[in-house]
Regions:
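Bacterial N-terminal signal peptides
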Residues: 14-23
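Sec/Tat signal peptide C-region and signal peptidase I cleavage site
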Residues: 26-30
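Mature extracellular "passenger" or substrate-interacting domains of secreted, surface-exposed proteins
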Residues: 31-250
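A short, hydrophobic C-terminal helix/tail in secreted or cell-surface proteins
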Residues: 252-269
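Short, charged juxtamembrane terminal tails flanking transmembrane helices
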Residues: 271-273
Length: 273
């Protein structure tokens, strides 16, 4: 049985500190009165780390944004990154960024076993505009199980031909589970000191959930585990989004579920010149 903590990418929170000395402006503008950044430019870029991929047999196809495997049919994973940075309002609604699609087809032969995915985050004050924080990256592990389509019950514990198993047993992904809120600080130089913000990442489509014990066991990880089960003979897309708040998010934002992906602790301090 795999151990999720041992198999994880040694989830070490990345701490970045940026201190820029300067002379503060003679008087704070009205939009700086509360010292809060109202809008952020958020850049998120995801890629597969092909050097980390493990196949169940012979090597298959892997590139930064797409993976494919199988004989007699082709299954795979595709990453769709946003065209550019998105604007996120502080204490506003979640804003979509990265999407991941599983192309699930009946196959034989070698399949994906595991791969690491790297997410890189860049935060820049947009309103009022100011200098951005350095980019920070985190690698996290995806464990995958290509399940026998004809089993009953299925590897996920469900009944074959019902629900997600309607076309045969669904395949199983397990993803390193992240915390809900990641804190960072930014100082606009208004004389009020650095303000603390929290960035949280959510899966919007309702597919990311705690998995049954049977599904965790099938992948070879300990329960509880977090992941997806995807239907056979379909392409399923999971959409992720970000929110930035001035208080920790304690309940899911409407239209979202559990947070996942980037586990970042960004400590940024900047003085306006």
């Amino acid at each position: 049985m795999k151990n999720t903590s041992a198999k994880s990418i040694r989830r070490t929170l990345t701490t970045l500190a940026i201190v820029a000395a300067g002379v503060s402006s003679g008087g704070a503008r009205a939009d700086l009165a509360n010292g809060i950044v109202d809008q952020w430019s958020v850049g998120v870029v995801a890629q597969f780390l092909c050097g980390t991929v493990v196949w169940t047999g012979s090597a298959q196809s892997c590139a930064a944004q797409t993976m494919s495997w199988g004989s007699g049919g082709v299954s795979g994973l595709d990453i769709t990154n946003p065209a550019g940075a998105t604007i996120v309002n502080t204490n506003g609604p979640s804003v979509p960024n990265v999407a991941i699609t599983h192309r699930n087809q009946p196959i034989t032969g070698s399949t994906l076993d595991e791969v690491k995915l790297r997410s890189t985050l860049t935060l820049t004050p947009f309103s009022p505009p100011d200098t951005g924080l350095p980019s920070a990256s985190l690698d996290f592990l995806i464990d995958f199980q290509e399940t026998p389509n004809g089993a009953d019950p299925c590897a996920n514990g469900g009944v074959n031909g019902v629900g997600v198993n309607v076309n045969g047993c669904g395949d199983i992904f397990v993803i390193d589970q992240g915390a809900l809120n990641f804190a960072f600080q930014y100082d606009l130089g208004t004389g009020q000191g650095a303000k603390t913000y929290f960035i949280s990442f959510f899966e919007q489509t309702g597919g990311l959930n705690p998995l049954p014990v049977a599904a965790c066991n099938a992948v070879g990880v300990t329960s509880p585990c977090l992941g997806f089960v995807t239907p056979e003979s379909q392409s399923t897309t999971f959409n992720f989004a970000a929110v930035i708040t001035t208080k920790p998010v304690e309940i899911p934002v409407p239209g979202t579920l559990v947070s996942v992906g980037l586990g970042l602790l960004l400590l940024g301090r900047r003085r306006r010149a």
